[in-house]
């Protein structure tokens, strides 16, 4: 299980390989110039790794299903969990992290999915819905504000 905070959280929110392009973080005050490393795509490219992206605040049932499938899978499994960090500058604080997770999926920033190489038929399941009326740009604008 990888808790993807998109920064090095234990050192004050420094830019990492998981930080999205353009994000402002410590040591990337002008915005990160390189692309975020897509761990899920890398693992899926092997063809034999169970991979899921989850966001518990957006879909608790999908989270539980992904964890159960990963545990039952007879090979390596990788679950990447969207994990808001205090360094994101969540307006109402970390008490609203679950709401932030829900919003990330709602606006299309984060996608919940499962890739199960052992599944019959389609091995990839996109579990999140198409982005709805959320404001993607507003979601991005408030992230990483504490580093300014």
Please state what every model-predicted region is.
Residues 2-9, 56-60, 84-85:
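Acidic, glycine-rich active-site loops and adjacent beta-strand->loop/helix elements
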Residues 12-21, 38-46, 93-96, 117-130:
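Noncatalytic linker/hinge segments flanking ATPase motor cores
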Residues 57, 63-148:
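Glycine/aspartate-rich loop-and-adjacent alpha/beta segment that forms the canonical ThDP
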Residues 19-73:
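Conserved thiamine diphosphate
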Residues 1-28:
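Catalytic or ion-translocation cores adjacent to nucleophile or general acid/base/metal-coordination motifs
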């Amino acid at each position: 299980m990888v808790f993807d905070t998109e920064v090095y959280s234990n050192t004050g929110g420094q830019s990492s390989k998981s930080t999205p392009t353009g994000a402002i973080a410590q040591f990337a005050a002008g915005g990160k110039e390189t692309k975020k490393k897509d761990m899920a795509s890398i693992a899926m490219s092997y063809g034999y790794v169970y991979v899921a992206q989850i966001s518990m605040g957006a879909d608790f049932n999908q989270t539980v299903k992904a964890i159960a499938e990963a545990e039952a899978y007879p090979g390596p499994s990788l679950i990447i969990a969207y994990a808001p960090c205090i360094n994101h500058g969540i307006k109402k604080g970390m008490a609203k992290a679950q709401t932030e997770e829900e919003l990330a999926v709602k606006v299309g920033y984060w996608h919940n999915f499962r890739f199960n190489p052992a599944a019959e038929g389609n091995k990839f399941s996109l579990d999140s819905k198409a982005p709805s009326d959320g404001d993607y740009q507003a979601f991005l604008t408030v992230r990483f504000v504490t580093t300014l």
